[in-house]
Amino acid sequence: MTIYNINLGIGWASSGVEYAQAYRAGVFRKLNLSSKFIFTDMILADNIQHLTANIGFDDNQVIWLYNHFTDIKIAPTSVTVDDVLAYFGGEESHREKNGKVLRVFFFDQDKFVTCYLVDENKDLVQHAEYVFKGNLIRKDYFSYTRYCSEYFAPKDNVAVLYQRTFYNEDGTPVYDILMNQGKEEVYHFKDKIFYGKQAFVRAFMKSLNLNKSDLVILDRETGIGQVVFEEAQTAHLAVVVHAEHYSENATNEDYILWNNYYDYQFTNADKVDFFIVSTDRQNEVLQEQFAKYTQHQPKIVTIPVGSIDSLTDSSQGRKPFSLITASRLAKEKHIDWLVKAVIEAHKELPELTFDIYGSGGEDSLLREIIANHQAEDYIQLKGHAELSQIYSQYEVYLTASTSEGFGLTLMEAIGSGLPLIGFDVPYGNQTFIEDGQNGYLIPSSSDHVEDQIKQAYAAKICQLYQENRLEAMRAYSYQIAEGFLTKEILEKWKKTVEEVLHD
């Protein structure tokens, strides 16, 4: 039995989908369930192992579509500059280095090699470019050996990619990809040819030899959904819903507009064993919508995309009147609204302090607002920090995001006993905040009148302290958090997998 989790790409700045997958990979390791995480995008800018290891995958859990047909394993880069130069004859004249880029020149020949290093302080090469008479002719990509080459031809003074070759460990070519205007058109093996990426993905899916003891979990489907659906019918198929799944504004009594990332999956819900959402509230909404707008009544299970190992008490005591938020400092997080609300509430509660954790593009705007209101003494930007032991030093958590599919920081905050104040929006806030019990849900409207928002948040901050309900709310936060303990989520996954495989 193997659980195959299918995604497209991964990068250094991963999205919530990759973090959810990495968390799931850890769950499957703890449950001793055999699992593979499949990435189907062409990923060459970095060795994929560096990206997957960075977020928490084990190498043996990762399958990359393009080297699956070779015997090369997922492994960190260990090829050196000297190893690279062995692929390229000629007598070296000199080298030029700029950060992670090393250029090697040769005597009496109009050619040079540019090595792109893993780290400017290490001699390890991720990929190399070979230039001859001013033209880029080849790029090689390395992990513990060369795994791919790209070939270029000059056209209108531009290097045009016309072929990729993937190798076995011993350097023998396994297959070529013939390119046309940057698009993969033909996959040429010694004994077979595939036309187009869908045919290539289908061959990959067939090579897994799926059966009813296997589970395929589809995280993203763009460009591959139909093939995965068709080939996964010999196994069990689950689909993860990672975001808001429909457009509220374009939905009426007779018609629903699904999020286009889920349209194919929902339209073909009869081919799916079960859907996975991360909150009970989204589960309820989706069940109602399937019943109302479709002929399908699929199984939908709620499994959170994160958990907390234990509840965290305040060992050093909490700082009185202390507020905290933690997120990317991005426009959609609306930290500026929180800053203005705290400035307003501070007029009534002068002991208030507000610490903001995270970094991002709104940093300078927030500093400007704080400075303009002479609020530096009680509102501070703290940058990045390991927050697990920090939440419990504070009394209240604030969030102004108008869309939070789950909200890992909200979960972590209640796990440290913090009451929360946030908008009454799906799905994270409605999951972690029980209005009046462990915080407050503030009504949200689409026009977002800033002054009204500021006043509403300030009023709730003051109400929380003036009604002297901190202790009761703290206890209720801990109570909600118990449902998100790691042991609970492990049990949910265990039960879900057992049910589907013994169905």
Swiss-Prot record:
Q: Could you tell me which residues belong to the region N-terminus R-fold-1?
A: 1-78
Main localization category: cytoplasm
Annotated residues for binding of N-acetyl-D-glucosamine = 242, 332, 404-407
Region annotation (Extended beta-sheet domain) ranges? 79-195
MF (Gene Ontology): glycosyltransferase activity; nucleotide binding
Provide the membrane topology annotation.
Answer: Peripheral membrane protein
Q: Which residues bind UDP?
A: 16-19, 328, 333, 358, 384-385, 408-412
Concerning CDD domains, the annotation shows: GT4_GtfA-like
The pathway that the record names for this protein is: Protein modification; protein glycosylation
Matching Pfam families: Glyco_trans_1_4, GtfA_EBD
Q: Where is this region: R-fold-2?
A: 307-503
Keywords for this protein: Cell membrane, Cytoplasm, Glycosyltransferase, Membrane, Nucleotide-binding, Transferase
Q: Which InterPro entries does the UniProt entry name for this protein? A: GtfA, GtfA_EBD
Renumbered to this chain, region (C-terminus R-fold-1) spans 196-306
Q: Which NCBIfam families match?
A: accessory Sec system glycosyltransferase GtfA
Its family remark reads: Belongs to the glycosyltransferase group 1 family. Glycosyltransferase 4 subfamily.
Give the protein name, as stated in the record.
UDP-N-acetylglucosamine--peptide N-acetylglucosaminyltransferase GtfA subunit
